[in-house]
Amino acid sequence: MVKHTKSKNDFDAELLLSETSKIGDPWVPIYQTAVDIEAHHFETAMSNLIKQPNINSTVIMRADILKENVFDVENGDSTFVSKLINKVPEFPSENPDDVILHRYLDDIDLRTISLNNSELKLNTKCEVVRRIIPRNPFKDHIINQTCLVLSSSNADPESHTEKESDDSVLVVYIPHIQSSDEIPFYLPPVYGVGILYHKSTLSIQYLPFNYQNYKTSPEIQLSLRNLDVTERPIRIALRLLQTSSKHSLGAKSGYEKRVNHDLVVPKIAFQNRYITLKKKYSSNLVNSWCESTDPKKHVFEDLAIAAFLIELWTVKYKSREDFEFRDLGCGNGLLVYILNMEGYSGKGIDARSRKSWSTYPENVQNNLSEQIIIPSVLLKPHPALSRLIPNVTDNFRYFQAPQLPSKNNCSCEAENVPADDKSTSHTNSSSTLTTYSSANLLESSQVCTTEEFPPNTFIIGNHSDELTCWIPLLGYPFMVIPCCSHALSGAKVRYSPRKQQKSNQQQNVSTYGALVDHTEDLAKQMGWIVEKEMLRIPSTRNAAIIATKRQPHCIDENDEVTQTRVLDILALEGGAEGWVENSINLMKKAPRNH
């Protein structure tokens, strides 16, 4: 017996290739490890892994459960059949050469195995047929697979011991294929995989193809027993053992998921859309990337966000003609490009143009604007003053900031902000300061107040930094993905945890979590009905705050009441003094890379 140590995480496993399987020939044991768990911990963990095979392999996107039979001695049997059982997964593509790979999807009959030679008496407790969807179904085949859970406690309930560690549980995976050369890359090249819990030990067992003939053809088993530990089937076995051990220990310790996904947009719809977009755009975008940032991170993240937005809009709007988007702080413009190319009307705005902008088609370039966002509430008169003097259009304020550039590099050229007749400029150690009036800024084509947006605008804030907390205050439906924490003045800030959390959870609330909560609270103060989704994107900052509807008492609120509400929030937040100056300064700074 050879001991194999995984030093990366101190995981010890014993290699069993020369041993006899406890579930009998023709099974071949591969690895085993000792675990301090009981049978129900293993069952709980494996129930989750059956539903989420992507935990075992990054090649797999998800599993769709097609049918499930549960045999419960105490509570009775139950059966589930999915509406997806007779549907082939769809990944719309305009390219006729894009062919989805799949095998025998109409084969939904449960597989069974013989354990006639087993030392253990096991009966079926649960049987599942799942459909495995790989991340790239244009490269890896979609297949159906039987998953069986067998238990000694189901075999003879009367002889069931009180000491649950004496129970044995076997989980078996059997792909629905007809020959060994049809096995997909993400599975080991065997007829079946067994994961066995027995006497505080977990082990991985392989059932070879043509196992029925193992007595007359010894090479059937020898082909597995002679494998080297570096070969892929053995490495997969170790991975399966590590995962089942880790998740079983997690079940014992009472591990609960920290976040719940797919609360707003169905997982299947999002993932199918993501696969389609990735196939359509990823290769070209990664290969032609001209920014200094990591292309794979930005490309795949924005493809995932685009997929989520498209499916969100499918849920919230009747058609794509019912709205148009504005991506505030759009950065490299990639999200705007993807959405425009998919037929969605909208524009992106950022204080600084990027190299990428000039690489997009002309129609996309025309939808990218180099502007700063100064919400109109900071430049217009108070509603009370507007009632008294209707002709007044600005609040008579003056701001000192560096001179805005006379030209920008984006496709939509903007003019200089005209300085007030009485403005002065002087040389500072770092730059020349110019005085701007609120009237100047309201008239400038380099300033976006958001008031010019059409009424059916949907605002996107994708890691939009200083704009994060402003977006819920602008009066349009939105989705904002917070990133860096800034106050309404544009200054960096660390928000405190919510008051109700301070008594027992304050130590668990991160700076990012506090920012997300604060953004959500601002939206609620503005009368929005807020939804929250933890996006499936390659980023730890993946919380999305979404609002498309207002509370009933705010639906018919007039502009004056809304503006007063914003001003009240500004006062509670400590004001927005410095926002104008900080925004103008952004046009002088180098873009952030995140």
UniProtKB/Swiss-Prot annotation:
Coiled-coil parts of chain: none
Transmembrane segments: none
Major location category of this protein: cytoplasm
Entries under Pfam families matching the protein: AdoMet_MTase
Domain of life: Eukaryota
Keyword terms, alphabetized: Cytoplasm, Methyltransferase, S-adenosyl-L-methionine, Transferase, tRNA processing
Catalysed transformations (reactions): uridine(44) in tRNA(Ser) + S-adenosyl-L-methionine = 2'-O-methyluridine(44) in tRNA(Ser) + S-adenosyl-L-homocysteine + H(+)
Subcellular location as annotated: Cytoplasm
Molecular function GO labels: tRNA(Ser) (uridine(44)-2'-O-)-methyltransferase activity
GO biological process: tRNA nucleoside ribose methylation
EC number, as in UniProt: 2.1.1.211
InterPro entries linked: tRNA_uracil_MeTrfase
GO annotations of cellular component type: cytoplasm
Family that this chain belongs to: Belongs to the TRM44 family.
Record's function text: Probable adenosyl-L-methionine (AdoMet)-dependent tRNA (uracil-O(2)-)-methyltransferase.
Entry protein name: tRNA (uracil-O(2)-)-methyltransferase
Organismal lineage: Eukaryota, Fungi, Dikarya, Ascomycota, Saccharomycotina
Gene name of the encoded protein: TRM44
